[in-house]
């Protein structure tokens, strides 16, 4: 009998007892609100058995409330040659919590993370998307991963995506005493319990009832609002290489020695070619541009899906021969080419996304998902995005600009901030010269320039077909059915990168006619601004990631014998969040309008959100303005 009881106890440690019936009526109403799916139960057990053995046990039950959830939250797990996925079990439950299916192994797909490139065939993922259509329903899955590497310990992130709420989530960490761990909690991570026995330390975090969040304009980045526990080792093993990770300095030394050292060797003929290409140039910056341009023309970027690809780049020789690589490989290759002409550069780990996520400087741990290159100049640092074959040297787009990243070198590493584009650099200028005929038809020329973050937004236009270019341009016009007669684009990749556009257009019946009146709308082409929620915030601060300056000038020649009846009053609204200015002038049959919208970057207190709303409303009011011109009838006619 004692043996039987002991056996049951041991089994209970490995099994996940079903403590929930997945009846959707049991989901609290606040968790269904604005949610596509609800995590009913999530358990992640991480068992670190030695410095080179770690096992995860994962169980998740997720109720899919609508069709969006089916595509957004499939079962997916990544693995590589250093990890093994085992014991996958997937069950489906109907809206009442009754089991309606067990997914056979044959329906769980297994494929390469990057198809068509044999170099990456060890990087794979397993996935399954339910074909059950009777929404809502619940998918429950269990699996385990056995891993030889202990550098990256999973973080506890109860809810990672917008539209997802959490009923209950738990993280159980077990580590042998010989493997001490570090952790740092952010943004209210629920309850924590600690315990230990003679051989192991145990930490458990649990949290419940987390409503879904949405990403709206001007919200703080997710890292400032999401519950999260970062977990990192004191010492670790990665692909057989031991290292310490209590400081950034230690990690930098390990990275250089084990991931980079010796992988920058080039074929002799390639090194000689670099020296020839740069022989007539004295400026270090110009030499960097020449080599960066060479990389852009010679190589192409191969994307490896997140979580896959390892940390070590391909060798520079492999990239030179094959002509492709991921961010690690292309950055390492560019670094090797620069080294061949005696220009030092530094491999830089960064988290690439549109929100500008910083490295947490106070908690050394593996935090990046992308690699770029830093080239120190005499007065500045030149940043190279080696995966982009169109951007000029030194330009970073919104995916990597203005955030803390980790610059690695032979003797260590340090946290640095990447290039910042302030409102004075983010400029979009629009100049419209046009004329109206007596039938209200408008013919004109638009000249637009884009700098700073706007440069990257418009750069892709250059490679589009003529038809696609016109379609995109039409989307910028707000007037009635414009006809694009001619379009040209010029991309300048000099010190201040700039896109210049010229657009010849016609708009039939642009102005309204009523007896002797001509009614002219000012809504023609921009400017725009992301809309804030039309609700004044009470407590939460808000965030403007990129400030900018947008200017638009209209010069409209009206038919002879028309005079302006209702010239608007000039406007100058200056607030902490930004500024709007409007000026109007009518002389010699020509209407001149100047409009400037400036938005300031930064984090602002909730009390100033009403000012942001005011700026937006002022912009919308400007675009609704209609000017009335009166035809002057000469006496005696």
What are these regions (language model features)?
Residues 18-637:
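A sensor for short, sequence-defined functional sites
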Residues 1-21:
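Bacterial Sec-dependent N-terminal signal peptides
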């Amino acid at each position: 009998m004692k043996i039987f009881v002991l056996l049951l106890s041991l089994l209970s440690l490995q099994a996940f007892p079903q403590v929930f019936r997945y009846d959707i009526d049991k989901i609290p109403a606040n968790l269904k609100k604005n949610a596509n799916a609800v995590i009913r139960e999530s358990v992640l057990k991480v068992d670190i058995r030695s410095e080179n053995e770690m096992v995860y046990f994962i169980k998740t039950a997720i109720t899919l409330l609508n069709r969006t959830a089916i595509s957004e939250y499939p079962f997916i797990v990544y693995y590589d040659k250093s990890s093994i996925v085992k014991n996958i079990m997937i069950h489906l439950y109907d809206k009442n919590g009754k089991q309606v299916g067990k997914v056979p192994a044959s329906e769980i797909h297994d494929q390469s993370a990057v198809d068509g490139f044999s170099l990456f065939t060890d990087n794979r993922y397993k996935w399954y998307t339910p074909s059950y259509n009777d929404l809502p329903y619940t998918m429950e899955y269990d699996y385990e991963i056995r891993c030889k590497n202990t550098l990256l310990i999973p973080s506890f992130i109860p809810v990672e995506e917008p539209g997802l709420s959490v009923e209950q989530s738990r993280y159980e960490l077990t580590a042998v005493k010989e493997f001490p761990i570090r952790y740092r909690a952010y943004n209210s991570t629920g309850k924590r319990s600690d315990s230990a026995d003679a051989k192991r330390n145990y930490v458990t975090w649990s949290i419940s009832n987390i409503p879904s969040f949405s990403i709206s304009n001007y919200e703080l980045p997710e890292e400032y609002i999401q519950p999260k526990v970062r977990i990192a080792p004191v010492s670790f093993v990665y692909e057989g290489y031991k290292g310490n990770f209590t400081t950034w300095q230690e990690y930098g030394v390990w990275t250089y020695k084990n991931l980079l050292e010796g992988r920058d060797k080039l074929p002799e003929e390639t090194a000689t070619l670099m020296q020839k290409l740069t022989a007539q140039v004295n400026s270090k910056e110009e030499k960097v541009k020449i080599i960066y341009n060479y990389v852009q023309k010679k190589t192409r970027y191969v994307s490896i899906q997140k979580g896959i690809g390892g940390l070590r780049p391909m060798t520079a020789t492999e990239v030179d021969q094959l002509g492709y690589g991921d961010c690690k490989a292309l950055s390492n290759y560019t670094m090797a080419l620069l080294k061949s002409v005696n220009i030092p550069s530094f491999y830089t780990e960064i988290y690439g996304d549109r929100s500008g996520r910083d490295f947490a400087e106070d908690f050394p741990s593996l935090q990046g998902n992308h690699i770029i290159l830093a080239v120190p100049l005499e007065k500045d640092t030149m940043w190279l995005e080696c995966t982009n074959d169109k951007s000029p040297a030194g330009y970073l787009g919104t995916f990597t600009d203005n955030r803390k990243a980790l610059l690695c070198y032979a003797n260590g590493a340090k946290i640095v901030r990447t290039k910042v584009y302030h409102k004075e650099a983010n400029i979009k200028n629009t100049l419209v010269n046009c004329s109206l005929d007596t039938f209200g038809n408008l013919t004109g020329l638009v000249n637009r320039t884009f700098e700073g973050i706007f440069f990257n937004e418009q750069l892709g236009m250059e490679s589009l077909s003529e038809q696609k270019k016109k379609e995109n341009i039409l989307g910028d016009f707000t007037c009635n059915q414009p006809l694009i007669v001619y379009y040209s684009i010029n991309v300048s990749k000099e010190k201040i990168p700039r896109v210049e556009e010229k657009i010849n257009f016609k708009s039939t019946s642009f102005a309204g006619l009523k007896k002797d009146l001509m009614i002219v709308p000012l809504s023609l082409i921009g400017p725009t601004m992301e809309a804030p929620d039309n609700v004044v915030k009470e407590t939460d601060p808000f965030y403007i990631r990129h400030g900018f300056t947008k200017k638009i000038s209209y010069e409209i020649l009206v038919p002879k014998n028309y005079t302006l009846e209702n010239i608007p009053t000039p406007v100058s609204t200056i607030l902490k969040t930004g500024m709007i200015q409007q000026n109007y002038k009518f002389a010699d049959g020509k209407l001149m309008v100047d409009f400037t919208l400036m938005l300031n970057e930064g984090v602002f207190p909730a009390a100033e959100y009403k000012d942001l709303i005011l700026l937006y409303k002022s912009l919308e009011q400007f675009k609704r303005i209609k000017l009335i011109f009166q035809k002057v009838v000469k006496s005696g006619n």
